[in-house]
Amino acid sequence: MNTPPEPRFEGVPPPWRVIDLPGRGPLRLRDSGQPANSDPARPVLLLFHGWTVSADLNWGSAYAELTSRYRVLAWDQRGHGSNGLRSRRRFRLEDCADDAAAVMDVVGVEQAIAVGYSMGGAVAQLLWRRHPHMVSGMALCASAMKFRQTIAE
């Protein structure tokens, strides 16, 4: 059996906390929070990981640098990692985007910069399409506007 790679951390990652997403269930979230004496208007980053990996595997080596400038929120998307939301029903990327909006509501964030890698880029774009008032900017890495439309693609 293959063992998944361990995430690499530079410094200390943001702590985990458990939040309850109404109608969705509990979710473990990495939240760097607002440090004491920091600018309350400091931008918030939502970090969306790629397909088949976890938030820590995708972003672990970047947490220290990012949290020095931004409030960082990261979690495992549905069906990913050991902390993602679990459901018996199939999910769509739109569900992941709506999960992100629910996370923002629960933690009291009105707007954020959505940062997505691979599948996470599609989730970031869907968050912007479905909840445009919540997205103040986007950074997309190794992503696409949409994925396969037909089996031939």
Where are these regions (language model features)?
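Flexible "cap/lid" loop of the alpha/beta hydrolase fold
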Residues: 122-130, 134-153
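Active-site loop/turn elements of alpha/beta-hydrolase fold enzymes
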Residues: 77, 119, 143
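Conserved alpha/beta-hydrolase "nucleophile elbow" surrounding the catalytic nucleophile
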Residues: 49, 112, 116-118
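Structural signature of beta-strand start/N-cap positions in the alpha/beta core
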Residues: 44, 71, 110-113, 134-137
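N-terminal cap/lid segment of alpha/beta-hydrolase-fold proteins
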Residues: 5-26
